[in-house]
Structure formats: C-alpha cells, structure tokens
Regions:
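Short loop-beta-helix segment that forms the pyridoxal 5′-phosphate
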Residues: 69-92
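Active-site C-terminal subdomain of aminotransferase-like
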Residues: 200-315
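Conserved PLP-binding catalytic core of the aspartate aminotransferase-like
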Residues: 316-345
Length: 396
C-alpha cells in the first residue's frame, strides 16, 4: 500500500498550487483544516445521507448545518439539503420550478452560469437569456419587456456571476415579481456568503439584504464555505414543495415517520462526510457578521478593490468593471491581444491567473477568494508587471 500511495502522491504533483495566494485564477479555495479532518474522520464510517439507515449521525448534522445556512438568509422555516454540487442544487431548484409552472419559460441573465440553460434542456423547459449591462447585471428594462410578453414561470437571479462576480439587482427584480407573479430563484452558489460582509458596495449590500425574499436559493459551501469540493446546498422557503418529491419504490426506507433527506432530494446516494465537515466548520466558525468567517470574506473583498484600484492607476491596464465581490477582470489597454501572452508569462513566474472572453475580447481574470491574497498583492503586481514587459517584448 505504501508504494501505491507514494505513486499517488507523485501523480498529484501535476497540479497548480491552488492553496497558494499566487494561485489567483479560478474559484478554488482551500478547505479549512477542521473540514478536512472532519471529512476524513467521517469516511471511516462512510455514511450515506440518502436515508437514516445509511447515516443517522451525519443526517442529523446535515439538517443542523442546512438550518444554519437558512438562518443566514433569514429563513426560520425552510426545506433544504446538501447536494454533490451547485449544478445538482440548481437542477433541483429548477425541477421544482418546472413542477409548479409546467411548460413555462425560465429566464436568466446572459451572464448567468451556463448550467441553467443546460438544466432547462434536461428538464425540457424553455429557456431564454436576458441581456446584461456593461457591469454584468441583468438588464431590468429587457427583463420587464420579456415578462410583459408572458409565458414566464421562473426568473433566475445570480448573486455573484462566475465571470465578474456581478450581483443582479434583486430589489428591482422583486418589484417585477410583485407585478408579474413569476417564481424567483437565486443562484448564490458563489456569492451567497457575502451577505455577512460589511464592506460591499451599496447596491450589492441591498441585494443581499433582500435575498431571503426569493423562493429558492442555491449556495456552494465548497466555494466560499471552506469545504472540500462536492458540497452544494439547495433551499426552499416553502416546505410544502416537499410534496413534489413523493414517490414509492421497493427501495423506500421506512426508518422514520419524519421525512428523511432521501425523500426531499433528487439525488440518492450522497456523502455524509460532506455534512460532517460542513457542520464542524460552522461550529468552529459561525456564520456571524463580524466573526472570523465573515472577516475572511471582507479581506477577499478588500484585496479585489485594492487590486482593481492599482490596475486602474496604471496606464497600461483597463479594468472591465468595478468588482462587486472579489473577482477582478482586466486587460492590456492598447494591446488587448497580449492577454494570452501575459497569462502564459505570469504562469512561468508561478502567478496563475484565468482568462475570460467578453464581447469578443480576451480579458485576464483573478478570483481573489483567499484572505491571504490581501497580503500578497504587492508580489502579485510585481510578477504581473514582469509578465507584461516580457509579453510585450516577445510579441512586438
């Protein structure tokens, strides 16, 4: 076994240093040590949270953990559970939406994650994109024009887009909901925890204040919740939607008169270890404004603001938009074709960035989701400067 594990360790060297602040590319945040330890501990039991028969302790911990997340959104009654990913969580939310509004169109911003269009196809529900403004927000005039045309069952707002970290104008969408009566789902997979931060801009802060007024929410603890990958969460404000899950099969579990997690989820087998890890993390780092967990989010936000400011003060760079959370997109101002070359040069200096295509132009992108990024900004900027100089010299 030792030889095999040594081989595994060697193979795992073929990775980017996701844990390090110089990895400033995609949405990868190291799990907290308590999450890793609790997850590893639970794997010795290997619980399956599909039913109480498969994971009594981990099922109880999941319910407690999900209730804490619901409370963060101001929900004291809810229906919800963990999932293996944000994609599955969104699938479940849109499945419920489709059951309540069969055949009706689902709308989401053109900047929303592509999974919504894909999921709608799987569910055989019509899907349409709503144009976004220059800041990446859903365009309210375009949304209302489409709503006025009728046949819309559900609108998806994104609380932190994958590309920009843009927060859709939820208060304005809620006003349209009162007028047109559609179901409202919030994809807060990335940004959901930022309601705890005290240093958001006024529009984003106001959107998070109203997040508890939607019908369903998806949040990914495996992004900003310090969890190992494989931990999403879906929440519904009305527990009555549980009736939509009713089924009978020879495999039905009869271990409790109370609805168990397998009876309110589309997924069957799910790792109970994810619930154990999440519960332990929130036990150590409660979801409190001003607490240690919230302070980590605020540090990431400060890092993004400072990074965008420094880039904006440099005549060589153009910042795509003011960051609303902790994602910054920028490009060479006079030489936009250099983005790929700068990306490559930065990687050679162990600064790992990401790329995003917006309106036919390639932009550099950084997700500054580690609190440590704030203390590493100078090092990041020095390497970025060198990458620019080398890229410009080699291509011109």
């Amino acid at each position: 076994m030792g030889a095999v594990l040594a081989e595994v360790a060697e193979r795992l060297h073929d990775n980017f240093p996701y844990f390090h602040p110089l990895y400033a590319g995609q949405m990868l945040k190291p799990p907290h040590p308590v999450a890793r330890a609790a997850y590893a501990l639970a794997t010795w039991v290997n619980p399956n949270n599909h039913a109480l028969d498969g994971g009594r302790a981990s099922s109880a911990l999941e319910k407690e953990a999900v209730a804490l997340i619901a409370t963060m959104f101001g929900w004291h009654t809810h229906l919800g559970h963990l999932t293996s990913s944000g994609t599955i969580a969104n699938l479940e939310a849109l499945w419920v939406a489709g059951k309540l509004h069969p055949g009706k169109t689902i709308l989401a911003s053109e900047m929303a994650h592509y999974t919504h269009e894909r999921i709608s196809g799987v569910l055989q529900l019509p899907f349409e994109k709503v144009p976004a403004d220059a800041q990446g927000h859903m365009d309210m005039a375009a949304l209302e024009a489409r709503l006025a045309a009728g046949d819309v069952g559900t609108v998806v707002v994104t609380m932190g887009t994958t590309g920009f970290g843009a927060v859709d104008p939820l208060p304005a969408v809620l006003r349209l909901k009162e007028k047109y009566g559609f179901r409202l789902h919030a994809d807060a997979a990335y940004g959901g925890y930022f309601g705890l931060a005290t240093n958001l801009g006024p529009e984003a802060a106001d959107a998070f204040v109203h997040l508890g007024e939607v019908d369903s929410i998806v949040i990914d603890p495996h992004k900003h919740g310090l969890q190992p990958y494989g931990c999403g969460c879906v929440l519904f404000d009305d527990p009555a939607v549980g009736a939509l899950y009713r089924h009978d099969s020879p495999y039905t579990y009869f271990s409790s008169a109370e609805l168990h997690l397998g009876e309110i989820s589309l997924e069957c087998s799910r790792a109970g270890a994810s619930a154990v890890a999440l519960w332990a993390t929130m036990r150590l780092l409660p979801l409190w404004p001003g607490g240690e967990f919230a302070q980590g989010l605020e540090a990431s936000r400060r890092a993004a603001l400072a990074f965008a400011q420094r880039l904006g003060e440099d005549d060589r760079w153009e910042v795509l938009c003011e960051p609303e959370l902790d994602i910054v997109c920028w490009a060479p101002k006079s030489k936009p074709e250099l983005s790929q070359a700068i990306f490559d040069e930065a990687a050679r200096m162990d600064l790992h960035l990401a790329l995003i295509q917006v309106h036919g132009r390639l932009w550099l992108r950084s997700v500054l989701m580690k609190p440590e990024h704030e203390g590493w900004l100078e090092d990041i900027l020095i390497r970025l400067d060198r990458a620019y100089v080398l890229a410009a010299a080699r291509h011109f």
